[in-house]
Amino acid sequence: MAVPAKKRKMNFSEREVEIIVEELELKKHLLVNHFNAGVPLAAKSAAWHGILRRVNAVATCRRELPEVKKKWSDLKTEVRRKVAQVRAAVEGGEAPGPTEEDGAGGPGTGGGSGGGGPAVAPVLLTPMQQRICNLLGEATIISLPSTTEIHPVALGPSATAAAATVTLTQIPTETTYHTLEEGVVEYCTAEAPPPLPPETPVDMMAQHADTSVKPQALKSRIALNSAKLIQEQRVTNLHVKEIAQHLEQQNDLLQMIRRSQEVQACAQERQAQAMEGTQAALSVLIQVLRPMIKDFRRYLQSNTANPAPASDPGQVAQNGQPDSIIQ
């Protein structure tokens, strides 16, 4: 017999994903890795089953617990992949390539053009992905380059090739947004180079563009390092809290042991006092019984000594017969 093919379930809806993220935000101290140190497996399992019940309440098809866990793992993987793209772009100075979800091409993707250096492609997170990023504690740095307006070169009739000048009305600026987990602290750094004089050689303009890109990359790198340090500090604080809780529990156990030892010492003292009282009572009883025992011994000795001198009646009769016979 042919085995019937398994029917594929429907994909998770937006409402189901929203419920999963909401429940994990509420129960992050039980289910998120850098919060749930020391949580027993029974509590984690109960929390996951609670999420499964809420998902099945709105789902069109019945979900199983492994499916919900797999969906949460996929969401985390997608968010971490985008954050890794930004980190690689900032640390390596290269723009992340296009992805299947972001599209094969478009503005802001690919390598940089011109002499101003490579530009960091923007990585935009949806509000749901931003919530997951905050929940995971990943620090994101999203660079949004602004538009640039450069007017064409204006040359007069008397201008020569050596004295060629350009008129620049707006210099490209780059604004960097930094988002940190659990604040949620958002701050923006914008750096605009100083305006150039109306008549500036083309070579000086190119050099100025190169120098303006480097400080911005340094600022982005510093912001990323500070975000990492803050995250490490939070993890360290969590470990310190756990150690403090363990120390408090050990102190409570030591106090309980000391109390039990004190109770045992009190019980031993009471037993010793009871033994002393018993010994005193026995000594008094012995002292009282000694004269009575002596009197009883004397009485017994007197009773055994009195019947010895009395004469035997048979001997008296025998002695009387000869007397009668003699008479």
UniProtKB/Swiss-Prot annotation:
Residues 316-327 have a biased composition (Polar residues). Widely expressed. GO terms for cellular component: cytosol; mitochondrion; nucleoplasm; nucleus; plasma membrane. It is found in: Nucleus. One of its GO terms (biological process) is negative regulation of cell growth. InterPro entries: Myb_DNA-bind_5 (IPR028002). Residues 87-118, 303-327 are annotated as: Disordered. Residues 87-98 have a biased composition (Low complexity). The keyword Membrane does not apply. Coiled coil: none annotated. Keywords: Apoptosis, Nucleus. Pfam families: Myb_DNA-bind_5. Signal peptide: none annotated. Residues 104-118 have a biased composition (Gly residues). Residues 1-70 are annotated as: Required for nuclear localization and apoptosis-inducing activity. It comes from the Eukaryota. Interacts with HARBI1. Belongs to the NAIF1 family. Induces apoptosis. This is Nuclear apoptosis-inducing factor 1. It comes from Homo sapiens (Human). The gene is NAIF1.
